[in-house]
UniProtKB/Swiss-Prot annotation:
This is UPF0235 protein PTH_1821. One of its GO terms (cellular component) is cytoplasm. It comes from Pelotomaculum thermopropionicum (strain DSM 13744 / JCM 10971 / SI). Belongs to the UPF0235 family. It comes from the Bacteria.
């Protein structure tokens, strides 16, 4: 089951990032996280920025609304997405 927690100002979403992929895409679920493949390498925060940009673009939000709360140096991250509800996140990623 996906870790997706609704808060009063947005949602917390657990993601599993696979860097250096062929293209940016959602790859389904990995345990309780949304698996995201990204072309960016895991160097100097590039994959983190690509993750923020990909999630923001998928939800039609500015990247400033997406913040990595934990897991900055890990493939598994918890991301806070401001200004959306859990249902919009589920629809955007086909969950």
């Amino acid at each position: 089951m996906l870790f997706l927690k609704e808060e009063k100002d947005g949602v917390l979403l657990k993601v599993r990032v696979q860097p250096r992929a062929a293209r940016n895409q959602v790859a389904g679920l990995y345990e309780d996280a949304l698996k995201i493949r990204l072309t960016a390498p895991p160097v100097d925060g590039e994959a983190n920025e690509a993750c923020r940009a990909f999630l923001a673009d998928s939800l039609s939000l500015p990247p400033s609304k997406v913040e990595i709360v934990s897991g900055h140096a890990s493939r598994t991250k918890v991301v806070k997405i401001a200004g959306v509800g859990a249902e919009k996140v589920r629809r955007a990623f086909g969950l």
